UniProtKB/Swiss-Prot annotation:
SUPFAM superfamilies: Homeodomain-like. It holds the Pfam family Homeodomain. Residues 301-360 bind DNA. Transmembrane segments: none annotated. This is Homeobox protein 10. GO terms for biological process: cell differentiation; regulation of transcription by RNA polymerase II. Putative transcription factor. Residues 23-55, 76-139, 195-219, 381-431, 448-638 are annotated as: Disordered. One of its GO terms (cellular component) is nucleus.
Length: 638
């Protein structure tokens, strides 16, 4: 047989339909049923056996069904026996304290047990044991859960009633609301910052009326307006725009646009302003005005671009056609005449040379080109103008280790050493300018109709030539020409080389005749790089027809060319200009007798002895009779 479980009654197992053994007894939270005695168990067994043998099973079953449908309420009998059931037959048992149960108790127990047995028999016969057991178990579990819930509620009510937790929560809410009120009343300015806004969002809002909140918001807006006006009026180093709410003031925008004393703090202002613009609907975008302000500040810091006028460009172009690499003196004079700085003039020539080198037209340029049009040689004008210039004032200008060694060669400066076609021997840098060259030599263009470019840096008239043998050293010290051991230095050029900046011609016309410059010469000073003391006057040597002495003039090896060799013409059509001179120095190498201390040069009446450096011209003539002197770089050969 299977187990038979009922509410509030002991559970028995039937063995061979005769013996019943007690197994378990569930407990209820309110009552504790007592254990049935041995007499009760035996009486129940006898009753079940007699009931099964009788024919009155049906009436008993009907009676049990009626009893099952009734709900019994907890009652207490005379012996204080607890009986409680819901939907089942009441169960009663005698108290464990009573040692001898009475007849009434025995009869009640017997009747209850018989009814229970009939009910169990009914379940067995209807083959619903499993279903009944499951239902009964479910009902009991539900009842237990309900009881536990009720107990928990009772305990919670007891705890909340006894402890002040509820009042504590109320107190916290009131404290939070009071704190919010304090912040609103005493920390108005801090409410505009991010921290105040975050605190406001994190704190629970006090439960107040909507009208009160509306009035407080209106007051806050007015105070924000006033605070914004104060900040805008008294801010001199900039303003940190607060992260305002949706109702931000419009006066803040107008003041930000019109205020010129505000210096924004870069990205911080932009980010805060962008955040405000993203959250506010009636606010104008401040990022554009801020960008304009930053742009104006950057533009003010930038240096103005200085442009050359068309007149300045025309003069610069004209000079560039004649001399592409002017010396420092020419640049200074040009700057004074044109109203420019010498640094700008130098940079213009550098840019022009770079443009021509890249393949531009020779001597042509865009009139709209400004000083900084080229990207190659651009140098800032604020630098020291003379910082990049190196002037050699030592008085010794030696090319190729200072020795011009020529073996059986004819030509200017004792050969082709200084006028070699290779540009490596020439000074092509504008930063290494020797001031021994007179500015007139580089700027005078006597024949204005001449179309062929001539050598403008050095004006060489070959009255005499330098004959230097294998050990000839050209040294010029204090304007004394010492011929020691086959040292022979001939220093004759036109007197235009002694013309210094003391009588500089105007740059508007570059055509001068030689007599105009000679009329101004009384005792010409020496170039600054040749004579250490400029106040020292040169001595006139007798027996010479020239107005200026040869000792006051620089020697040929001390003159460095400032123009590139590729622009030196190689035509010999200008050699006819030497026909105006009565004396032509023809150097015949076959007739040069080189003794220990004697140099004999056949120059049509010009005798060069050991310690005498002279050039004798047979015919005395005035320089005014000569034709206007041209610039020549051609080499006179035999």
């Amino acid at each position: 047989m299977q187990e038979i479980i009922t509410n509030n009654i002991p559970t028995f197992k039937l063995q061979n339909d005769v013996d019943m053994v007690e197994e378990t007894q569930p407990t209820t939270p309110t009552t504790q049923p007592t254990t049935p005695t041995t007499n009760t168990i035996s009486t129940t067994t006898n009753t079940i056996t007699s009931t099964l043998n009788t024919n009155n099973i049906s009436p008993i079953l009907e009676e049990s069904e009626e009893e099952d449908s009734n709900e019994l309420i907890i009652e207490t009998d005379e012996n204080n026996t607890s009986v409680s059931a819901t939907g089942t037959t009441p169960t009663s048992s005698s108290s464990s304290s009573s040692s001898s149960p009475t007849n009434t108790t025995t009869t009640t127990t017997t009747t209850t047990t018989a009814t229970t047995a009939n009910n169990d028999f009914k379940n067995i016969t209807s083959n619903n044991i499993n279903k009944t057991n499951s239902n009964v178990n479910t009902n009991s579990e539900i009842k237990n859960i309900d009881n536990s819930i009720m107990n928990s509620l009772n305990r919670y009510n007891n705890i909340t009633t006894a402890s002040p937790s509820n009042s504590t929560m109320i107190t916290m809410k009131s404290a939070i609301s009071s704190l919010d009120e304090i912040v609103k009343n005493t920390m108005k300015a801090q409410r505009e910052s991010f921290i105040a806004n975050e605190d406001k969002e994190s704190l629970p809002e006090p439960q107040t009326n909507s009208n009160v909140n509306g009035n407080e918001e209106a007051k806050d807006e007015k105070e924000i307006h006033l605070l914004a006006k104060i900040l805008l009026n008294f801010s001199s180093n900039g303003i940190a725009v607060p992260n305002l709410s949706e109702s931000s003031p419009a006066v803040l925008n107008t003041k930000l646009k019109d205020s010129s004393n505000l210096v924004p703090y870069g990205g911080d202002l932009n980010t805060s302003v962008n955040g405000v613009v993203g959250n506010s609907s009636g606010m104008v975008d401040l990022s554009a005005s801020t960008g304009d302000l930053l742009g104006s500040l950057n533009a003010a810091n930038k240096k103005k671009r200085q442009r050359t006028s068309p007149e300045q460009l025309a003069i610069l172009e004209q000079i560039f056609e004649t001399d592409k690499m002017p010396s420092q003196q020419i640049r200074v004079r040009l700057a004074n005449q044109l109203g420019m700085s010498s640094r700008r003039v130098q940079i213009w020539f550098q840019n022009k040379r770079a443009k021509v080198k890249r393949g531009g037209p020779f001597g042509k340029g865009d009139d709209n080109d400004d000083l900084f049009a080229e990207g190659e040689d651009i140098i800032d004008e604020d630098e020291d103008e003379d910082s990049s210039l190196t002037i050699d004032e030592s008085g010794n200008n030696n090319n190729n280790s200072g020795n011009n060694n020529n073996n059986n060669n004819n030509g200017i400066m004792g050969g082709h050493g200084m006028l070699s076609s290779s540009p490596t021997n020439l000074n092509t840098s504008s930063d290494n300018i020797v001031p021994s060259i007179s500015p007139m030599l580089t700027s005078i263009n006597i024949n204005s109709s001449s179309s062929t470019p001539t050598l403008q840096s050095v004006n060489l008239l070959n009255n005499t030539n330098n004959n230097n043998n294998n050990n000839n050293n050209n040294n010029n010290n204090n304007n004394n020409n010492n011929n020691n051991n086959n040292n022979h230095t001939t220093t004759t050029t036109t007197t235009t080389t002694t013309t210094t900046t003391s009588s500089s011609p105007p740059l508007t016309s570059f055509n001068f005749q030689l007599n105009q410059s000679l009329n101004k010469l009384t005792s010409p000073p020496s170039p600054p790089s040749i004579v250490p003391s400029p106040n020292k006057k040169t001595k006139q040597m007798g027996g010479f027809s020239l107005n200026s002495t040869a000792s006051s003039l620089p020697s040929f090896p001390q003159i460095k060319l400032n123009s590139s060799s590729k622009h030196i013409p190689t035509d010999k059509q200008n050699n006819s200009d030497f026909s105006n001179f009565n004396n032509n120095n023809n150097n015949n190498n076959n007739n040069n007798n080189n003794n220990n201390n004697n140099n004999n040069i056949n120059n049509n009446g010009n005798n060069n002895s050991n310690n005498n450096d002279s050039n004798n011209n047979n015919n005395k003539s005035n320089f005014s009779d000569y034709q206007p002197l041209k610039f020549h770089n051609s080499i006179v050969k035999n």
